[in-house]
């Protein structure tokens, strides 16, 4: 099945395409896209709810309108992917956990700026700082939370899990732009940068 492009009907009228990266050709395509991309929206799914020794089970990335789901359990050599990714500015939501998991399990350390949308929301005094709540507030789109308690270590992953995973990064760039603009208007961007550097 390899490089699988799936078109999903999400909560907006547009149709999204994502690539499920489980073989070398799909991974090479992703590397080329990352090299040419600007900031990369990043998230991970782990098996912390189902296993004592947690591990990264899925890595989600959005590069503009392109969305990739990388399967770390597929036996691929991800060292080149992680090296290229480390050179890109990253956008995450509640990224402390994701970066810690990637660091401890894969040795990944970002070398460029990180923008955390949850920290931005906190600095702006927004009460509901969960990703779904922020997307609802800023874009009037409901993305659902049905995948939060999934066992991400089990294969195959379901269509519902994959759709949930795509939504974790799909809106991050637009959300970061909105929150970043408000941080700048309130002269709080440096506070945010300092908090992100501490992750």
Residue ranges and their predicted role:
Residues 1-18, 29:
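Short glycine- and acidic-rich boundary segments immediately preceding or forming the N-terminal edge
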Residues 183-199:
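Acidic catalytic cores of enzymes that act on phosphate-bearing nucleotides/polynucleotides
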Residues 3-5, 168, 186:
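Intrinsically disordered, low-complexity sequence elements enriched in Ser/Thr/Gly/Pro
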Residues 18-28, 32-42, 46-182:
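Conserved DEDDh/DEDDy metal-dependent 3′-5′ exonuclease domain
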């Amino acid at each position: 099945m390899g490089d699988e492009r799936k078109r999903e009907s999400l909560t907006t009228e547009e149709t999204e395409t994502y690539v499920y990266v489980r073989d070398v050709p799909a991974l090479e395509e992703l590397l080329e896209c990352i090299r040419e991309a600007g900031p990369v929206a990043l998230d991970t799914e782990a098996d912390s709810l189902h296993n004592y020794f947690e591990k990264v089970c899925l890595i989600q990335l959005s590069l503009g309108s392109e969305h990739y789901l990388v399967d770390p359990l597929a036996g691929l050599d991800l060292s080149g992917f992680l090296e290229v990714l480390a050179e890109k500015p990253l956008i995450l939501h509640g990224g402390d956990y994701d970066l810690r998991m990637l660091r401890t399990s894969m040795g990944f350390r970002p070398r460029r700026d990180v923008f955390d949308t949850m920290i931005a929301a906190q600095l702006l005094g927004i009460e509901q700082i969960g990703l779904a709540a922020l997307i609802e507030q800023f874009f009037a789109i409901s993305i659902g939370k049905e995948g939060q308690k999934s066992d991400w270590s089990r294969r195959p992953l379901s269509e519902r899990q994959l759709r949930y995973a795509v939504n974790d990064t799909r809106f991050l760039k637009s959300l970061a732009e909105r929150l970043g603009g408000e941080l700048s208007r309130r002269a709080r961007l440096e506070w945010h940068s300092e908090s992100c550097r501490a992750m």
